Amino acid sequence: MNYASPRHAGPLDALLIEVDRALQVLSRSAVAGRAYPAHAAEAPLADTEKRHAAGLMRVNHVGEICAQALYRGQAVACRDAGTRELLREAAAEEVDHLVWCDRRLKELDSRPSLLNPLWYAGSFALGVAASVAGVPRNLGFMAETERQVEAHLDEHLRTLPAADERSREIVRQMKDDEAGHRESAERAGGIPLPAPVRGIMRAMSKVMTGTAYRL
């Protein structure tokens, strides 16, 4: 099934599209629309460095699982056609990130998080809930999500093993894309979220990253 949602899909069609998307994401069968950005030669890494790089890329992979589900949840409950399209476009670009992180995990002889089904389900539900708050808050939620993801990616660029340029190339491209998503949401009318909401989002993100690094 095509990732793009038909503009006039009925409720059953919409449900089938979301189920298909979830299955493709969770089964690791999604296909990137852009070329793999890692071009540097694979450098030798010590076992501890390899495990650390894999842990960070697993965190990034979970982040893309969550972004995929979050934006799909926001879009499915959003009544504004323009906002829906913006969310779906961002979700489609996140597929590239998802596939890139998965490929890098394989190169590092590692695996995605064992909890991915839970991350996806929870994020989809959160996206639906965010959409109920209205378009400005919905877009504000998207912008804040991307802002926090950018901060995580900056940290990963600092803490990845010095020799792991392949992972860095992926993370740099992801960071550029996330900044574009944030700017698009702000231009479309997203408003800043209240400080308590931003704090809750950071706390939830901290739990996710700490867990995904190991599991």
Curated annotation (Swiss-Prot):
Residues noted as binding Fe cation 1 in the record, renumbered to the chain: 64, 94, 97, 178
Binding sites annotated in the UniProt record for Fe cation 2: 94, 146, 178, 181
Cofactor note: Binds 2 iron ions per subunit.
Keywords attached to this entry: Cell membrane, Iron, Membrane, Metal-binding, Monooxygenase, Oxidoreductase, Ubiquinone biosynthesis
InterPro entries from the UniProt entry: COQ7_proteobact, Ferritin-like, Ferritin-like_SF, Ubq_synth_Coq7
UniProt xrefs under SUPFAM superfamilies: Ferritin-like
Pathway(s): Cofactor biosynthesis; ubiquinone biosynthesis
Cofactor(s) the record lists: Fe cation
Topology within the bilayer: Peripheral membrane protein
Biological process annotations from GO: ubiquinone biosynthetic process
Any single Gene Ontology cellular-component annotation: plasma membrane
Predominant place of localization: membrane
CDD domains: DMQH
Substrates-to-products reaction catalysed: a 5-methoxy-2-methyl-3-(all-trans-polyprenyl)benzene-1,4-diol + AH2 + O2 = a 3-demethylubiquinol + A + H2O
Subcellular location: Cell membrane
Pfam families, sorted: COQ7 (PF03232)
UniProt GO molecular function: 3-demethoxyubiquinol 3-hydroxylase activity; metal ion binding
The protein's Enzyme Commission number: 1.14.99.60
HAMAP family: COQ7
Family, as annotated: Belongs to the COQ7 family.
NCBIfam families: DMQ_monoox_COQ7
Matches recorded under PANTHER family: 5-DEMETHOXYUBIQUINONE HYDROXYLASE, MITOCHONDRIAL, COENZYME Q10 BIOSYNTHESIS PROTEIN 7
Function: Catalyzes the hydroxylation of 2-nonaprenyl-3-methyl-6-methoxy-1,4-benzoquinol during ubiquinone biosynthesis.
Name assigned to this protein: 3-demethoxyubiquinol 3-hydroxylase
Native source species: Bordetella avium (strain 197N)
